[in-house]
Amino acid sequence: MEELVGLREGSSGKPVTLQELWGPCPRIRRGIRGGLEWLKERLFRAREDWYFLVALGVLMALISYAMNFAIGRVVRAHKWLYREVGDGHLLRYLSWTVYPVALLSFSSGFSQSITPFSGGSGLPELKTMLSGVVLENYLDIKNFGAKVVGLSCTLATGSTIFLGKVGPFVHLSVMISAYLGRVRAKAVGDTESKAKEVEMLSAAAAVGVATVFAAPFSGVLFSIEVMSSHFSVWNYWRGFFAATCGAFMFRLLAVFNSEQETITSIYKTRFRVDVPFDLPEIFFFVALGFICGILSCVYLFCQRNFLRFIKTNRYTSKLLATSKPSYAALVALVLASVTYPPGVGRFMASRLSMAEHLHSLFDNNSWALMTRNASPPWPSEPDPQNLWFEWYHPRFTIFGTLAFFLIMKFWMLILATTIPMPAGYFMPIFIIGAAIGRLLGEALSVAFPEGIVAGGEVYPIMPGGYALAGAAAFSGAVTHTISTALLAFELTGQIVHALPVLMAVLAANVISQNLQPSFYDGTIMAKKLPYLPWIRGRQIGSYPVTVEHFMNSNLTTLAKDMPLEEVVKVVTSTDVSQYPLVETRESQTLVGIVERTHLVQALQTQPASWAPGQERFLQDILAGGCPTQPVTLQLSPETSLYQAHRLFELLTLQALFVTSRGRAVGSVSWVELKKAISTLINPPAPK
């Protein structure tokens, strides 16, 4: 039944519903409706993004803090259970191992049962998406719940499994950003452009890092280095604005919950400010960077090959295919047994949480000098004021526990990365790097117990400064980033070691970037995700190689003067998504692009006015309304491989046509470009 309308007395003549005419308080309701329409118009402007970025930052800060709060309660319950079971070794062992085994198996089973995209870090897939590849259903909101629950269970295992939350939280932030983008597009009644979506996803990646560490500057820079090969400076403010909102809200919640008196850094340090290091120590910081670079190459090589072994081994591949929770439980049992405190875990500070690991490693006092004439007892519980007691053993010494910690955590982390569950891998790498730096710093403090003498002044060595540099250098070398130096400063709240830390990070990257792909690039290769290899500079001869050497010359074109019978044969015999449109079959002059879906739809709905038996051509279909796209960008056969690679990366392209004097002569897609780069980097052996 149609709604009745009428005219209000004294109105301009615009009809309104009778319900509005006779309803209570019509003027107030009209005012409220007008205000809401004005608010909608203001909020959903095409170029207004501040409200979107604020909502994204605040939401991710709330989620991050809520997860930390819940995880902290679960970890505290685990410690209470381990403490209250008594002195029986069997009960203590079961209380220590069953907890992480149950949590990890549930994390793997729950997340994988909902969606397989919820496992792992998520950063390799996001990096692939931002390069232009479409991964279906990867940003669906249903993945969000699976990722949150699975990640919470993973982190609730504590330092036993030794995993973090950076990568999965970036994935969560990007999913929220994609969902908010769809909501905004629906409210406006328009579809969001691909470029706009990429801009918002880049800002969301920065928010994910910032709300984990409360570090907006390094969050933006780290997300740019990891996720993008090219970045628009115009989009800079989005990342910084959203990351600042998220980091501020994250630390503000800690103040509201009486965890902090004011907004401060997460891992506060007490490094000497007047003279934090002497000039000769620069050499040791650079040497530490080279050591971290070499060790990062060893780690990346072992991790990538072990992951390949797990996937190809007959037994492990079958277990992963049939019962992922069983594999997760088996690995968790191994890791928990190794870290059992009365056993081997006594020599690797296994009772400390990951945050306590960093707090203790950043201590500016020399443990080796403090234990030279004293032997502190091993407390029944970790002492918050003396966490370094957990690193000391009278027979093993500080150097033994640090070295043993590095050796054990090295292979344990590699094993943990094979578990199909939501988990981050940056924080464990950061802690391992801090242990490397701490070991070198303790060795230097013993070698120079009175400090380094230069010009008559004595400056004692602070091992905590080397731990800070090692954390930034090793994590930067593994991820191929420089922003980890800034992250170390934002985490500790001190910048007194800015120059030596940055030099260590650069030295580590010199080694790792020339010998191994980054952790995320290696994962992309292991998962066989579509990606373009990186051409490192111009010195490898990418300019002499031109497009005509690797383009696909078997190009199927559609000419305007082609009969419809031949068009149908071409469409049914090929499965390409788009066809190059040429002027005539003889000239082969490229004039546009026809999408396969539009062409099939036009062929199926031929006009009824066409006389039967009359020969029709493709131009008749085009004149009837079949849409075509202009060719805005094309390659020349003389275009170099380096230039083609830069175009594909910069514009996130999937394929381009090759023309010579206007004639369509071939095409280049990711497949041809990747094969050409791989052949250039690893040329085949001469026959």
From Swiss-Prot:
SUPFAM superfamilies: CBS-domain pair, Clc chloride channel. SMART domains: CBS. Ca(2+) binds at E259, E261, D278, E281. PANTHER family: CHLORIDE CHANNEL PROTEIN 2, CHLORIDE CHANNEL PROTEIN CLC-KB. This is Chloride channel protein ClC-Ka. It catalyses: chloride(in) = chloride(out); bromide(in) = bromide(out); nitrate(in) = nitrate(out); iodide(out) = iodide(in). Keywords: Calcium, CBS domain, Cell membrane, Chloride, Chloride channel, Ion channel, Ion transport, Membrane, Metal-binding, Repeat, Transmembrane, Transmembrane helix, Transport. It is found in: Basolateral cell membrane. Belongs to the chloride channel (TC 2.A.49) family. CLCNKA subfamily. Residues 551-609, 626-687 form the CBS domain. CDD domains: CBS_pair_voltage-gated_CLC_euk_bac, ClC_1_like. It comes from Mus musculus. PROSITE patterns: CBS. Disruption phenotype: Mice are born at the expected Mendelian ratios. They develop nephrogenic diabetes insipidus associated with polyuria and water diuresis. Gene3D superfamilies: CBS-domain, Clc chloride channel. It is a multi-pass membrane protein. Homodimer. Interacts with BSND. It comes from the Eukaryota. Specifically expressed in the kidney, predominantly in the inner medulla. All nephron segments expressing BSND also express CLCNK proteins. GO terms for cellular component: basolateral plasma membrane; chloride channel complex.
